[in-house]
């Protein structure tokens, strides 16, 4: 492999892809980022059994090829480079990174396999990214941190025609957000359960100036894919039965009040000063 890259684009792509790598991976392969040079692009991919990431940038490819290197180390190295151009060359089990006066040699694996992303019939045309991010932030409010109950750590996503309903609960709170999308199959009716922490991580990494595309197998979903600005994230779905909470959401509420958010938060904070930890506050 012999590739010429723009340093800024290379560093950004490596940083985004390597974010899914665990701090202490159980398998050395899971500590790596796969680089593949082909047809004028340099492709990046990483995986951690729960979420995968794929990205690509334009590059000058003199020799096609692929290699697996330590992702976090590669991210630190590329972030420190200051030259406009960076060159990547493989020679056997070594990746050489050259950028002006800097030359770094990294141990590499030539044989590797990083799982791909979700592919299915339920994917949609691009949707507005800010709308999706807002829905994720609202729906994840009530996600539980109890790892011994995996179902409560997830957000249920119900795809019903052009509507997506996101719900979470930790047994004490409920959160729900709804947004519209444009599915390729207008009659799609599928429910998925995705880990809330992964969903928030995906939302944080999105480019909100670009649209987002969701992808899954509508008949038997096991993965949920998110594509945005050339970046693809895939999340493993949680296998379990989400609590029946729909009846707790009323279609109409007889009493409604519109208040200033900060005023409400300030009032609650003052009252909570004299309340015991986790004690309820009457409103």
PLM regions and their residue ranges:
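Structural preference for solvent-exposed beta-strand-turn elements
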Residues: 1-283
């Amino acid at each position: 492999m012999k590739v010429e890259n723009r340093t800024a684009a290379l560093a950004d792509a490596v940083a985004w892809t390597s974010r899914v790598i665990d701090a202490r991976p159980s398998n050395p392969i899971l500590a790596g980022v796969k680089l593949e040079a082909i047809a004028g692009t340099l492709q990046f991919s990483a995986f951690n059994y729960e979420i995968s990431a794929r990205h690509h940038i334009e590059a000058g490819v003199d020799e096609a090829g692929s290699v697996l290197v330590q992702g976090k180390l590669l991210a630190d190295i590329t972030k420190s480079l200051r030259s406009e151009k960076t060159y990547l060359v493989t020679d056997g089990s070594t990746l050489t990174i050259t950028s002006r006066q800097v030359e770094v040699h990294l141990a590499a694996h030539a044989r590797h396999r990083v799982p791909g992303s979700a592919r299915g019939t339920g994917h949609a045309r691009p949707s507005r990214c800010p709308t999706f991010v807002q829905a994720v932030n609202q729906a994840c409010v009530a996600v539980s941190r109890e790892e011994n109950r995996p179902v409560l750590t997830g957000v249920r996503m119900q795809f019903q025609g052009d509507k997506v309903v996101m719900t979470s609960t930790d047994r004490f709170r409920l959160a729900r957000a709804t947004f519209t999308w444009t599915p390729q199959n207008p009659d799609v009716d599928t429910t998925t359960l995705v880990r809330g922490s992964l969903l928030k991580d995906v939302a944080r990494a999105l480019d909100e100036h670009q649209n987002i595309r969701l992808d899954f197998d509508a008949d038997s979903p096991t993965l949920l894919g998110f594509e945005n600005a050339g970046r693809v994230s895939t999340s493993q779905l949680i296998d379990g039965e989400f609590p029946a909470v729909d009846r707790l959401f009323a279609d109409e509420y007889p009493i409604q009040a519109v208040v200033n958010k900060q005023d409400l938060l300030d009032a609650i904070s003052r009252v909570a000063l004299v309340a015991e930890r986790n004690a309820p506050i009457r409103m």
